Design a protein with these regions (language model features):
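Active-site hotspot residues in diverse enzymes, especially metal/ion-binding acidic/histidine motifs
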Residues: 1-279
Length: 279
């Protein structure tokens, strides 16, 4: 664990970084890729086994494993930004499922969590959704994890260890739950990919998904733009499956959000991840 003084310093740096490069406050989520791009980094997704990510200090490059889950990739990007802001120099991050004991890795992880999930943003959206953290349900935690672009486990870790918004009992009860069971309880169809439940509470950010993921929205929403989603039938809600890379929009009379679909396990430069693959 970081000492309180150092933790406060890192929180301040994370919030300052958001404000300086994206001009946003602590009450909205951010896309770490957009932030890295605004900071002048080249972001590349690469296929390297046992590799999580790398920050190349002298070259202004962030490398991210193309083979990891999307939530993990976004956290890795924020983690590598942390290495830069905290002055750690060039760092290679290998896959360590239980976390690293190295001080610089703990600092970069803490920075990433506070960059992506400031307490003000979590409290705002939980209020919009009517979420009570003392009674947090698995489906609510899953929905919020997708909103902040984190894995289910990373979201719970941030809630308990860093933000102190849930109890140990809640953390312990939610963490072992299998994602396929949560998804089955949320969708009338079997979803192999991730599920994004969206609505008027989903504000200030695009819906970033991969081919094979699903969006659940209210029945009164309209879809605009290229046909990159396949609408599936349901009695109560609209369900869309992402079938092709591209950018479009989902909206109704009082809400709207852009949808950005990337190729599954895309490798290459970040700015091309939403483009069709050339044969």
């Amino acid at each position: 664990m970081l000492n309180k003084v150092r933790a406060n310093q890192i929180v301040a740096k994370a919030l300052q970084t958001r404000k300086k490069f994206l001009n946003v406050g602590a009450n909205v989520p951010i896309c770490p890729y957009n932030l890295a791009e605004s900071m002048g980094f080249d972001i590349r997704f690469v296929n390297i086994p046992t590799f999580e990510g790398m920050y190349l200090a002298d070259d202004g490059v962030i490398l991210i494993s193309a083979d990891r889950p999307e939530g993990r990739k976004r956290f890795t990007c924020a983690h590598e930004i942390g290495h830069h802001i905290l002055g750690h120099g060039t760092v290679i991050d290998e896959i360590i499922e239980t976390g690293s004991d190295k001080k610089i890795e703990k600092e970069a992880d803490f920075f990433a969590g506070m960059l992506l999930m400031p307490s003000s943003a979590v409290l705002r959206v939980s209020k919009d959704l009517g979420v009570d953290f003392d009674l947090l349900e698995p489906q609510e935690a899953y929905m919020l994890s997708k909103y902040f672009g984190l894995s289910f486990t990373a979201f719970l870790t941030q809630l308990y260890f860093n933000l102190k918004l849930i109890s140990w009992a809640t953390y312990k009860n939610l963490k072992p739950i299998k994602l396929q069971n949560i998804k089955a309880s949320m969708s009338p169809i079997k979803a192999s990919g991730q599920i994004f439940v969206v609505g008027d509470w989903w504000r200030e950010r695009a819906i970033d998904i991969e081919v094979g993921d699903f969006i659940i929205a209210d029945n009164d929403c309209d879809f605009e733009g290229p046909q990159i989603l396949n609408q599936l039938s349901s009695l109560d809600v609209q369900i869309y499956e992402a079938i092709s890379p591209g950018i479009s929009k989902l909206s109704n009379d009082h809400w709207g959000a852009y949808i950005r679909i990337s190729r599954k396990n895309y490798s290459g430069m970040y700015q091309f991840r939403h483009e069709e693959e050339v044969e």
